Regions:
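N-terminal-proximal low-complexity accessory segments that begin disordered
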Residues: 2-72, 84-93
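Short Gly/charged-rich anion-binding patches and loops
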Residues: 81
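Single conserved hydrophobic/aromatic residue that forms the stacking wall/gate
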Residues: 396, 402-405
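Solvent-exposed alpha-helix faces
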Residues: 41, 400-401
């Protein structure tokens, strides 16, 4: 429990949290500390009793279910009988009528792009940055470092050229399957260039095009000697890096040194299961990292193998479209924030009845306020949205949507 508190409205707020909100969270926002805490005070004393009621409903349901299982211990459970029991106690509800989701301003990473989603503890800034930057990763490195590529020899710190060739072979076969060239294979191509707004693949002095020319979307560098080619498949992008001087391109006729794959399109920054935030100091650490992500200035300095390194958010990736115009692709994973559920309370704030604040309500206020910084820049959500992940909840109640701030 926090040691020092300040009285604000009908609240007792820990020094650490109060200082963070007033001096960091609200900085550069058109919300005064007076307005923020007044709104929070009104909201939490309105919603905390409802939160308590939700928990009591859950406890009553759980007790009835526990008692049923004790009573029927050792008996074969008839599914229809069990469903009837769950319906009678109000746990199961009748299916409602069909409806249409009408949510607006949702980013493509949620509506259009199917891809991996990471979950990362928000308390660890370095892990969080790694996850945010996992939008684009080296396919060569990923394959080389996993057992997708079989190897008779065990792992070694030294580079294995045979394994490296197997990686290149795997990627070329992957491209043959999903981004095929019309009339030939990706194996042993000699060069790539752009002509008449199309990707041209050279092999044995012949020119070839992709079977689906729309999969080529852009490039970087000179059209006759591009440094990167951008391919799109199923709304995910691949960046073919061309650098004949690179070590990885030493035995590649076309000078392809790597393939960068669009990977983790979204990431849940977790305030709940993967962290142990038990007091104001812990919660502020979580909130500060989320604020840094929303402001775009989160950085971490660390030492690895005797070298000092700095990790920060990657910038967007810039290219030239096939029409010759500027093209930018999102350089980072779309970040979602997972709030704590109904059950937990936290000593960061004490309410007027002496109880601890419901942690999920505190999370909702502070994480959404932090996201207002991104609304100005739109570097995370391009549509001006914040994505809050809540644990699975069971409730009879419909909570109000009163604008408290």
């Amino acid at each position: 429990m926090s040691k020092n508190y300040q009285n604000v409205k009908n609240l007792k707020i820990s020094d650490e949290l109060l200082s963070f909100v007033n001096k960091e969270l609200l900085k550069d926002l058109d919300i005064s500390s007076e307005k923020f805490w007044e709104g929070f005070d009104n909201a939490v004393h309105d919603l905390a009793p409802q939160n308590k009621e939700l928990i009591q409903i859950r406890e009553k349901l759980q007790k009835k279910i526990d008692d049923w299982h004790i009573k029927n211990k050792g008996n074969k459970i008839e599914i229809e009988q069990y469903k009837k029991f769950l319906s009678e106690i109000g746990y199961l509800k009748e299916e409602g009528s069909d409806f249409k989701i009408e949510t607006k301003n949702v980013d493509d990473e949620i509506t259009q792009i199917a891809g991996p989603q990471l979950v990362v503890p928000i308390m660890n800034a370095r892990y969080t940055l790694n996850a945010a930057n996992a939008r684009w990763v080296s396919l060569y490195d990923s394959l080389y470092g996993t057992n997708i590529i079989e190897s008779e020899e065990g792992g070694s710190e030294r580079y294995d050229p045979n394994r490296g060739q197997e990686v290149i072979k795997y990627v070329r076969e992957f491209f043959d399957k999903y981004i095929p060239i019309d009339g030939t294979s990706w194996k042993n191509i000699s060069a790539l260039k752009i002509k008449d707004k199309n990707l041209i693949i050279l092999k044995e002095d012949k020119e070839y095009k992709l079977k689906d020319e729309n999969k080529f979307v852009g490039h970087r560098g000179d059209i006759n000697k591009p440094s990167a080619i951008i391919i799109k498949n199923n709304n995910l992008h691949f960046e073919i890096i061309i650098n004949p001087k690179a070590f990885s391109a030493a035995h590649d006729i076309a000078g392809i040194s790597d393939v960068i794959a669009e990977s983790a399109v979204s990431t849940i920054c977790d305030n709940e299961d993967s962290v142990a935030a038990v007091d104001a100091e812990d919660k502020v650490a979580c909130y500060r990292n989320w604020l840094g992500l929303m402001r775009g200035d989160l950085k971490v300095q660390f030492e690895k193998n005797g070298k000092k390194l700095e990790r920060k958010l990657n910038p967007d990736r810039s290219y030239i479209s096939k029409e010759g115009k500027g093209l930018k692709l999102h350089g980072r994973s779309l970040l979602l924030i997972r709030n704590v559920g109904h059950l937990m309370t936290n000593s960061s704030i004490i309410l007027n009845d002496g109880s601890e604040v419901p942690e999920g309500i505190m999370d909702a206020f502070i994480t959404t306020t932090a996201a207002l910084h991104d609304f100005k820049k739109k570097k995370n959500s391009r549509t001006g949205s914040i994505y809050i992940v809540k644990p699975v909840s069971y409730t009879h109640l419909t909570l109000p949507t009163t604008p408290y701030v």
